[in-house]
Amino acid sequence: MLKKVAYQIVPLQIFLFAFWFKNGFIDKIMGVLLGIVTPEAAYSGDTWAGWKGYIVGTWDKSQVGHALLSPTFDFMFPILILLQCLPFVLILRSVINGEFMSNKERPWLFYAAVSSLFVTSCMAFTQTISGASDSQYLWQFIGFSMVAIMYIRNEQGK
């Protein structure tokens, strides 16, 4: 059984899952829900108001961000939450599908890497036009997502 595991793929699955599980599910969904259910026990930075203050405050540092992005927060934040959860859901599907095994096609892992690239690109766009410091790590993660896509495609011989 252990000889059939594709050890070159498992770290990629673990990293993508851990990154998006923490940034999408734990930080956003659990933080916002905890802020609704028990506002006195929730960390204020992870509640809806906390995220709004942080994100809109970052966007408001630039005139472009203030004019174009800040008014859309209440509409865009739920979309961001869903987008940030998509890569880790696709990784779960990849693991359930057994894509960590050798000689196995990895479509769900590929979809997870593409969704990671898309989500990170959207986030980097908003942070870059706002001049936010968060854009630096996002640009690095865009690079990681692109390398992951190339690695998966190369590993499958495509």
Tell me what each language-model feature is.
Residues C85:
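Active-site-adjacent helix/loop patches that line small-molecule binding or acyl-intermediate pockets
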